[in-house]
Amino acid sequence: MYVSISFLLGLSHLVLCCLLTFIVNFYLPPESIDFEFMAHNWSKGRSPSSTLGLSWFKAGFRFSDGWSMFYSFGLPGVALPGSPPRSHLLPGTQILIRSFQPCESAKHSARLSSLLTTTSYSVS
């Protein structure tokens, strides 16, 4: 019984991750991301903490110029990339932004090189 419940919870988590990745990749264009909004409306915070009790998801997409952005965010906050209204975000929700830039020689193979920056924002 315990194994089947664990399996169903794991499966539902996988389905939610896939759905979220689909939304980010195919529904939200890169141009909809408003970093100005994020920088001014969300206070800078620490990396996601397990003490918050949030389920963290990761999603990412590639820009046409070779840049890639990857996001991690808490499920309760409904913090999708873009410029979501603050009223839709619960206090304590954090977004972790990781920026990568591909090497010149790796652009055609879509391989990423070094990690450039890691920034974390939390809703106050």
From Swiss-Prot:
Topological domain ranges for the Cytoplasmic compartment: 1-2
Extracellular side of membrane: 24-124
Transmembrane found in the keyword field: yes
Sites where a glycan is attached: 41
Regions that span the bilayer: 3-23
GO CC field: membrane
Keyword Zinc belongs to the record: no
Top-level taxon: Eukaryota
Keywords assigned by UniProt, alphabetized: Glycoprotein, Membrane, Signal-anchor, Transmembrane, Transmembrane helix
Membrane topology: Single-pass membrane protein
Location relative to the cell: Membrane
This protein's name: Putative transmembrane protein FLJ36131
Organism, scientific name: Homo sapiens (Human)
